[in-house]
Design a protein with these regions (language model features):
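Short, intrinsically disordered low-complexity segments
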Residues: 37, 46, 690-727
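Intrinsically disordered or highly flexible coil/loop and linker segments, enriched in small
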Residues: 95-99, 110, 155-156, 431, ...
Length: 761
């Protein structure tokens, strides 16, 4: 049993955002567990704190370590659960406890309360009329107006009194002092979905959907908690399945969290859930104000809502009766955090569910290779929806070879075939979507005379060309650090006038489409057009209401949206996601192409899809054309096995970053040496007891430059480590953290760990 507890005190002060050590009383040693709330002496007072670590190692002189006073008996259990989850994240993803706590309890600081004030009459009607007569005798007109109104309506909103009756706060306070009225204040929680209209919408499931629901509900009724993977083709009605499962949980007094991959999904998803469940639904996303975010956590904590919808941060909603976590589009890379701790929402959801006996449902038309592998090996239960609802056919997919287009003299980003189909849809009054995974006008700008590419001086990346109202001639922007300059008229290297952008982005596509189809109404949706809070909703609403014929956008337009009048989808450059130094490149390409194709033909008319590419024979393109997930999975797994990549193997990436390139390299080199030493020690210890070293063996590669070796004047070096056993990587991470703790060689280097990364550094 541990002798000491490291505790985070419950004070909203950045300077105190660290652990303090306390001695555990003998009578408390068997009761105290990780995540519990306790009372501790702090300065001259006693306050609450959270147990985040139990240890036998004193950090100070034993005589100076104070003792825990007691365990909080009436604490909200969910808070302790989230603290325990933070401890798990710290252990498994490599970050400080403070990083983990700020992730699982993102609202550590109370927002300014939104107060709703009303004025209430304290007197009987006879007493009030007597006071009114006195005010009239003294010609106190404001008091007469107020008291007359309150005799008619004994409680009124204070803002209405001040605005409509023209009664000042001074008059209200005077009557309050006289004991005639009282001012009542209530906390008013902001509800980001209060403007939606609940219709009690409910769809009858088809046989296939009902079969999936029944399979899960049988286990739920028997209190068997599992992780399920629903593999359902686009348009198969996964959302209706989710809602039926949630209704089942609500009927049993449980709560549910629904994760979405991007904020772009919130508008349509919330509308469908709100139509079914009304104000029991709330949303959590990064575009809410701090006050709105705080209010949603308070509403969840108080039990005012039962369903929270949002991106990965919604996973930490403080529900006390959590019964179900749904992760829609579970394959999305946005579920993996790119900041410390670099957690994956899927793994973390499964861990949280395990803490409270909840179930997890993963859903996708194109499951991640990792999830499908776990379903195939029995770790998850696989359930399938093989048909679209109402037996609607999957869209017809054509692949256009852009090399042949160029040979035929077509230099436009729009192939001849795509232009023909667009013309046809405009004549029929049908809608279409054009997808390209690139913002701006040009992916990079280069000189055709000398080949010079204009790069960011602070980052190892090319600048992108953008056109705005403020910069109609264009500007150059770095998408990593925000650096920007005006578009140069001549090459900075050789002075040539032949300088221009390559690889058209969304802005350029918009210009080309408007020029080619001047009669068309065009909308563009990317990060540049959706920067304000309502940007997504406005664009999606306009397109859903058929106020535009063509929607052009980046990957956010292909994420689960349902537009029945869309009968044509054009993927303009399928190769862009293949040109990435990342072992997920083919998987992402297949997923994007399949998801994009799934937007077509969801209404009464059949859909068509045109995929434009320079690599028509690539297996990800061919599998997407045939919409054959199994064929893609088998080919991809062969590649992963051959190159020792997840999910067959596990990978740890160690990033070393410094202001000085040599320092970053030297730090990485020291870590590689320590890895070798650790591995030799493990090997010797295992051989002494006759154990097989193979399962613990790791294969380090590096130090090496990542795909982007410098960002914002910070140099990066990486080490890649592969092994079959995930826990071995966790043990290695712990060893390296201990090695670096008091090592001055790392004082100018930031070291981060990323387990099974979703993208290259």
């Amino acid at each position: 049993m541990a002798e000491y507890a490291n505790i985070i005190v419950d004070i909203f002060n950045e300077k105190l955002d660290k652990t303090f050590q306390y001695r555990i009383p003998e009578a408390m040693k068997e009761k105290l567990t990780l995540g519990m709330q306790v009372y501790v002496p702090f300065g001259k007072r006693n306050i609450k704190g959270y147990v985040v670590e139990l240890t036998d190692e004193p950090e100070f002189e034993v005589a100076k370590i104070k003792e825990i006073i007691g365990i909080v008996t009436d604490s909200v259990p969910i808070e302790s659960q989230l603290i325990a989850l933070a401890g798990w994240m710290k252990k498994n993803y490599g970050a400080t406890m403070n990083h983990a706590l700020k992730t699982v309890i993102p609202i550590k600081k109370k927002s300014n309360a939104v107060e709703h004030k009303s004025v209430r009459l304290k007197l009987t009607e006879i007493e009030a009329k007597s006071e009114l007569a006195e005010f009239e005798r003294k010609h106190q007109k404001a008091r007469v107006r107020l008291l007359s109104a309150l005799i008619e309506n004994p409680q009124m909103d204070q803002s209405m009194i001040t605005q409509k009756l023209n009664v000042s706060g001074t008059v209200i306070r005077a009557l309050e002092t006289m004991g005639i009225v009282e001012v009542v204040s209530e906390r008013s929680y902001r509800n980001p979905v209060s403007h939606l209209d609940s219709k009690g919408y409910h769809l009858t499931l088809n046989e296939e959907q009902q079969s999936v629901v029944d399979a899960i509900e049988r286990n739920l009724d028997q209190k068997i908690a599992k992780t399920y993977l629903i593999k359902g083709v686009t348009g198969s009605g996964k959302t209706e399945v989710y809602m039926e499962l949630i209704a089942h949980m609500l009927a049993h007094g449980k709560q549910a969290i629904v994760l979405i991959p991007e904020i772009a999904l919130t508008f349509q998803t919330v509308m469908r859930f709100y139509n079914r469940f009304g104000d029991r639904v709330s949303i959590m996303n990064s575009r809410l104000s701090p006050g709105e975010r705080f209010d949603q956590f308070e509403r969840a904590k108080n039990g005012d809502v039962d369903i929270m919808i949002g991106p990965r941060s919604a996973l930490f909603t403080p529900f006390s009766k959590l019964g179900l976590i749904i992760i829609d589009e579970e394959h999305e890379s946005s579920y993996k955090s790119e900041t410390l701790p670099r957690y994956h929402a899927r793994e973390t959801a499964i861990e949280r569910a395990g803490m409270c006996g909840a179930s997890v449902v993963l859903g996708s038309a194109t499951p991640s290779v990792e999830s499908y592998y776990k379903a195939k090996t029995g770790e998850y239960e696989l359930l399938e929806l093989k048909h679209r609802v109402a037996e609607k056919p999957l869209p017809k997919v054509e692949v256009v070879d852009l090399r042949e287009e160029l040979k035929a003299g077509n230099r436009s980003i729009l192939s001849v075939r795509l232009q023909e189909l667009m013309e046809d849809r405009l004549k029929k009054g049908q809608q279409m979507m054009l997808f390209i995974n690139r913002r701006g006008v040009a992916g990079f700008v280069s000189c055709r005379a000398c080949g010079h590419v204009i790069k960011c001086p602070h980052c190892d990346v090319s600048l992108s060309q953008h056109v705005t109202r403020q910069h109609p001639e264009g500007k150059m922007v770095c998408h990593y650090c925000g650096y920007e300059i005006p578009m140069p008229k001549t090459c900075p290297a050789c002075g040539s006038r032949y300088i221009s952008g390559f690889k058209a982005g969304t802005q350029k596509i918009e210009m080309i489409v408007k020029e080619r189809f001047p009669q068309a109404r065009v909308l563009r949706m990317d990060m540049d057009t959706t920067r304000n809070k309502e940007g997504y909703e406005q664009i999606l609403s306009a397109f859903a209401n058929q106020e535009a014929d063509i929607l052009i956008g980046t990957q956010m337009i292909v994420k689960g949206h349902d537009f029945p009048n869309v009968t044509l989808v054009g993927v303009l450059a399928a190769d862009l996601s293949l040109y990435v130094s990342d072992y997920h490149a083919a998987e992402r390409t297949f997923q994007l192409l399949t998801q994009a194709a799934g937007r077509a033909g969801r209404g009464s008319e059949p859909g068509e899809v045109v995929i434009q590419t320079y690599q028509p024979d690539h297996y990800s393109v061919q599998a997407a054309k045939e919409q054959d997930y199994e064929a893609f999975y088998e080919q991809e797994m062969e590649y992963r096995r051959m190159l020792l990549y997840p999910p067959v193997w596990n990978m740890l990436v160690i990033l070393c970053a410094s202001k000085w390139e040599q320092t970053a390299y030297d730090s990485a080199k020291l870590l590689v040496q320590e890895i070798d030493t650790w591995q030799e020690n493990i090997k010797a210890a295992m051989e002494r007891v006759g154990e097989d070293f193979k399962k613990k063996r790791v294969f380090p590669v590096g130090p090496a430059d990542p795909a982007v070796a410098k960002v914002n004047d910070i140099y990066k070096k990486v080490i890649y480590i592969k092994t079959k056993d995930y826990q071995t990587l966790v043990e290695l991470k712990d060893r390296l953290e201990h090695y670096m703790r008091d090592n001055r060689a790392f004082k100018d280097t930031v070291v981060q760990f990323d387990f099974n990364p979703m993208s290259g550094f």
